Amino acid sequence: MRIPPSAQSSILAAFLTLTPLFGQSGKATVDNGTWLFIDTTDIPASRQHLNHEALFSKYVEGYNRQVLKAIDIVQAHAMDGGGYFTGMHAKPTESPIGYKLTLFGKPLLDPPRTTSYCSGSSYGVFIEALNLLLPEGSSRLSEERYESLRMQEPDGSRREDRIKFWGKWNDDGWGTHYAMVQYSGIGEEIPPERARPGDFMNIAWVKGLGHSVVFLGWFVKKNQPGMVFWSSQKSTNGYGDLVLWPLTSVKSVKTVRMTHPERIFSFDVLREVVRELPGDTVAPPNR
């Protein structure tokens, strides 16, 4: 169901109070360098739920736990998914995310619609994770970096792809890599075998363009690998979990882990990025 705007703040406040915050030790998530396959019983039957932290945090420590909690925060705004829509020339134009997203209390977007699309939803999780990790960040965020993170121009018009932080995240190709690794240094590239719940991922399809998601895990079914992730897509009516099995539709991926959230206060807003990068083939070992 859709949560009325008047009730969202009280529901989210209660959710944040009642749900314990894991991984407060202030460290990046680490892994052992090998494939991790989650238990298929941890994959919920419901596409929309608020159990990402509860279900998947047992597989990780550190910052990825806050990312998982951030998924629940975004999802709580629209338990029916909120709707999926793309159309930059539509009137009103597309909305990256369907609610008034803020960073440290500073508005990033006045949404023209209540719908969302993939890169907007993953960016929302990134921002909400920063709110959890750096609760006193408002006084440390410079105006030029705040402006770079905004999802609209000052006049409310659409911020174009490749422009500043959000424009790089929203770019075709490996947007999370452009924004988190190259542009800001907030993240680190991770090969597929090291991917863990709470990592950010761009997927290139065999047919079609790509998808920006928050990775939840690899799994094996009938001796074939699959993956589960959270994003906004048409098949889930916006925000929701998607189970992909088998992986025959995936051409390649690019995975990024949040490792230095504090660099949100120091990145160079004029830094350029390299867009032409090869993707990583997903080839788990036979099990």
Language-model-detected regions and their locations in the chain:
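Bacterial Sec-dependent signal peptides at the C-terminal "C-region" and cleavage site
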Residues: 18-27
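Bacterial N-terminal signal peptides that target proteins for export
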Residues: 1-11
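N-terminal capping segments
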Residues: 26-170
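A generic secondary-structure boundary signal that marks alpha-helix termini
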Residues: 20, 127-131, 207
